[in-house]
């Protein structure tokens, strides 16, 4: 199986399955001398881990990360950073009834046709359990980017039909939904409680923002920064759409509305989402992710078995009724990994570039 590594100068390779003994990651390319601790990584892992509220899966994983290499006396050495998270709460027997069936809208059917073999326990490699390692690796990238003045934060901007207006960043960390509007939390809780009673699931929209990014990151033509972000964010389980800036709303805009005009004081808008011609403009980089409703629900669904016979499938086990609730730190991690990679690439080729034009912010 290929496709387990992302990046060119800052690379992240992950391995492990949902019900295997552990998840592992190798992070290469981190500059030496970065102060890093287990707490730096654990902070984001705790934001993602399961079982933290009644609105997420009740699988109880501590997600305690171990640093195996690449860090000595609290500082990165420049060598490969090895990371490990042990799985501790697998209940593989929950999946024995579906080992010869294909769950609708899961990767069971496609993995079977591609490999001829599949780990049916919790989806194996296709499970979102893998994203714990992305969050751990992304925490390293976030720590380095922060030292360069770059801050990456995300929030839930929609759950099912409920749109969530942005109010404050402080509110995001004070509820289980990563909602920036505390007044919306009771409505979100009531909606999720009813959803659970209906034995159904729902999708969500996540917004992730990077502030403090200097102009110049991104490599035309095929490694445009927005293309790389879309690639990385689309690689997250259940993501079915990515928008940069105004995204699909630009279809209804006129050029006079959409263009981000410049003044000596700064940009007048940010419809481009901080990226022009595939290169960062110095404005905040803004991306939106659409996550589908999980198909792991107890309502029966039609499918087939490995012999092609029709069956009704009821998915047992412990699942998120809305995978978007825990997706915010994952989206932050993937944006951080992309920006870290491009920062190092930009520095390698363009470190000596100097222009007299001032860097503009947004009014």
UniProtKB/Swiss-Prot annotation:
EC number in record: 4.2.3.5
Keyword set, alphabetical order: Amino-acid biosynthesis, Aromatic amino acid biosynthesis, FAD, Flavoprotein, FMN, Lyase, NADP
Residues at which FMN binds: 125-127, 237-238, 277, 292-296, 318
Pathway it works in: Metabolic intermediate biosynthesis; chorismate biosynthesis; chorismate from D-erythrose 4-phosphate and phosphoenolpyruvate: step 7/7
Pfam families: Chorismate_synt
GO CC annotations, alphabetized: cytosol
GO biological process, one term: chorismate biosynthetic process
Enzyme class: lyase
Catalytic activity: 5-O-(1-carboxyvinyl)-3-phosphoshikimate = chorismate + phosphate
Cofactor binding mode and count: Reduced FMN (FMNH(2)).
PROSITE patterns on file: CHORISMATE_SYNTHASE_1 (PS00787), CHORISMATE_SYNTHASE_2 (PS00788), CHORISMATE_SYNTHASE_3 (PS00789)
Family annotation (CDD domains): Chorismate_synthase (cd07304)
Residues that bind NADP(+): 48, 54
Cited InterPro entries: Chorismate_synth, Chorismate_synth_AroC_sf, Chorismate_synthase_CS
Tree of life domain: Bacteria
Cofactor(s) named in the record: FMNH2
Subunit structure as annotated in this protein's UniProt entry: Homotetramer.
Assigned protein family: Belongs to the chorismate synthase family.
Protein name in the entry: Chorismate synthase
Organism: Pseudomonas fluorescens (strain Pf0-1)
Origin organism lineage: Bacteria, Pseudomonadati, Pseudomonadota, Gammaproteobacteria, Pseudomonadales
Annotated gene: aroC
């Amino acid at each position: 199986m290929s496709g387990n590594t992302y990046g060119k100068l800052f690379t992240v390779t992950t391995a492990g399955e949902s019900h295997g003994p552990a998840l592992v990651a190798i992070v290469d390319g981190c500059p030496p001398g970065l102060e890093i601790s287990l707490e730096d990584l654990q902070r984001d892992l705790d934001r993602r881990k399961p079982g933290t509220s009644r609105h997420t899966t009740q699988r109880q994983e501590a997600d305690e990360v171990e640093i195996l290499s690449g860090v000595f006396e609290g500082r990165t050495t420049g060598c490969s950073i090895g990371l490990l998270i042990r799985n501790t709460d697998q209940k593989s027997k929950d999946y024995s009834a579906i080992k010869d069936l294909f769950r609708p809208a899961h990767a069971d059917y496609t993995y079977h046709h591609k490999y001829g073999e599949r780990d049916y326990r919790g989806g194996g490699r296709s499970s979102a359990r893998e994203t714990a390692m992305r969050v751990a690796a992304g925490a390293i990238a976030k720590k380095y980017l922060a030292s360069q003045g770059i801050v990456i934060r995300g929030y839930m901007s929609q759950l099912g039909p409920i749109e969530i207006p942005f109010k404050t960043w402080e509110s995001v960390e004070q509820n289980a939904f990563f909602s920036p509007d505390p007044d919306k939390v009771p409505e979100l809780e009531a909606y999720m409680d009813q959803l659970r009673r209906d034995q159904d699931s729902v999708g969500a929209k996540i917004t992730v923002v990077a502030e403090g990014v200097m102009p110049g990151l991104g490599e035309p033509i095929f490694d445009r920064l927005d293309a790389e972000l879309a690639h990385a964010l689309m690689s997250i389980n259940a993501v079915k759409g990515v928008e940069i800036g105004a995204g699909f709303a630009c279809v209804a805009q006129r050029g006079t509305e959409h263009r981000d005009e410049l003044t000596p004081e700064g940009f007048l808008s940010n419809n481009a989402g901080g990226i022009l011609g595939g290169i960062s403009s110095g404005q905040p980089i803004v991306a939106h992710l659409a996550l589908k409703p999980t198909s792991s629900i107890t309502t029966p669904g039609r499918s087939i078995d490995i012999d092609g016979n029709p069956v009704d499938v009821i998915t047992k086990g412990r699942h998120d009724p809305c995978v978007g609730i825990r997706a915010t730190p994952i989206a932050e991690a993937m944006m951080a990994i992309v920006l870290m990679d491009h920062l190092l690439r930009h520095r390698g080729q363009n470190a000596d570039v100097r222009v007299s034009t001032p860097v503009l912010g947004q009014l």
